Amino acid sequence: MSSTTLDRPADKEYASFYAGYVALVPEGGLFALLEQQAVGTQKLLRPLGEPKSQHRYAPDKWSIREVIGHLADSERVFTYRALRFARTDATPLPGYDEKLWAQTTNAHTRTMASLLDDLQVLRTATLSLFRGFAEAD
């Protein structure tokens, strides 16, 4: 994947559930978008601090920390799936229960800074993996 741009996938290339997410991605180079998003996320969330990171807008809703944990979990899952596609592994990919994962996470006990550090390291690893894919992948 030496190119920094990819064509937007055709509707038949992803489950209809993801159509809204795909539509939200701006046009542009993949790596630049991923890098900009990482910077923007850090700039938005780091100033919140620890007390605000525990905020829930309603009972039984995720805190900001838990949302960040979910972002990290999702990036891990989708990066793993991208690796499987790149390696032409045809084994069926199971889904995952994000609600169960949220119930069993330790995001609420971690500091906001550690969660954001983890998210940044994870994005750096994602970019490294994607840059390492051959064009044919």
Residue map of PLM features:
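Aromatic-glycine hotspot motif
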Residues: 1-64, 76-137
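Histidine-centered divalent metal-coordination motifs
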Residues: 70, 74
